[in-house]
């Protein structure tokens, strides 16, 4: 990952709407009311919700406990052989019970855009609006075998309806539903997560939702396993299955190997090796992932 990529992450964070920045770290103490254990709020997914990088967890965004309001902002860059991905977003957590999130996703097609007839550097865009509700359990406390369980919804709106129609997508807009279970086993320093997502998204929704022959929500799995070397440093891996709806291009499952480090209580950096398989006729899309999160 180049220094230029790190600058791009910083630039993404600076481009967030002003309302996302009104909760400055200086006010974190009264909102946090003691706060969660370091890193137990997870980081920000590419869809803006709290979790890992690729997989959604049941964690609620921000450092606040059940007595406070918290949140986070993030910027993410993924550099692949034939594409560049950027996303940024904001999430708010209310009393460690409810999470509301927003993310903007951008996929720069670089030279592939010319091959697809879109023009070099054509960028696919999508907005993701999310809500999550914690139903039971706690990531850290309570019964050692009882995970934190949450349900969630993510409504996605592509900005490229003409492209979606051209590749055979059924609709430029769609909604995912999921249920997640997450637990940190403190004595073993191991975090485990399992999520079942009901979706018909093509390439996360950037190529629309469903097709003429596959227009039903189908369950997909998102799993994460991480080991905490210290209070500040975590390594792990994730696996996310994907639907394969489009006849024009194969869609593969996603895998990553990541490391997350808490620079401070409020700032976490995550780096990963990602394998996103085939994207819109371009195979072997493996590369580097870098994300910066600021949480309060």
State where each predicted segment sits.
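Surface-exposed beta-strand-turn/loop segments characteristic
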Residues: 110, 203-209
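Transmembrane alpha-helix/helix-exit interface in multi-pass inner-membrane proteins
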Residues: 193-195
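Outer membrane beta-barrel transmembrane domains
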Residues: 207-296
């Amino acid at each position: 990952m180049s220094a230029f990529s790190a600058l791009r992450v910083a630039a993404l964070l600076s481009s967030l709407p002003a309302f996302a920045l009104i909760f400055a770290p200086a006010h974190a103490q009264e909102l946090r009311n003691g706060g969660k254990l370091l890193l137990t709020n997870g980081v920000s997914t590419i869809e803006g919700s709290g979790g890992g990088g690729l997989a959604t967890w049941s964690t609620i965004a921000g450092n606040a406990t059940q007595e406070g309001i918290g949140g986070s902002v993030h910027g993410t860059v993924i550099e692949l052989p034939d594409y560049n991905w950027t996303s940024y977003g904001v999430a708010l957590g209310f009393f460690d019970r409810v999470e509301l999130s927003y993310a903007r996703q951008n996929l720069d097609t670089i030279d592939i855009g010319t091959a697809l007839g879109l023009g070099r550097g054509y960028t696919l865009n999508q907005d993701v609006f999310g809500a999550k509700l914690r139903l039971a359990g706690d990531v850290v406390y309570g019964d050692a075998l009882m995970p934190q369980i949450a349900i969630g919804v993510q409504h996605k709106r592509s900005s490229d309806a003409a492209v979606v129609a051209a590749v055979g997508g059924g609709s430029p807009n769609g909604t995912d539903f999921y249920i997640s279970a997450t637990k940190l086993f403190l004595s073993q320093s191991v975090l485990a997560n399992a999520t079942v997502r009901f979706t018909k998204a093509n390439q996360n929704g950037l190529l629309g939702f469903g097709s003429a022959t596959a227009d039903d929500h189908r369950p997909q799995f998102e799993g994460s396993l991480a080991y905490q070397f210290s209070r500040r440093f975590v390594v792990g891996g994730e696996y996310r299955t994907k639907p394969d709806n489009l006849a024009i291009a194969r869609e593969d499952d996603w895998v990553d190997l990541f490391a997350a480090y808490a620079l401070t209580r409020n700032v976490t950096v995550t780096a990963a090796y990602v394998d996103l398989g085939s994207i819109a006729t371009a195979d072997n899309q493996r590369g580097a992932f870098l994300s910066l999160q600021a949480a309060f």
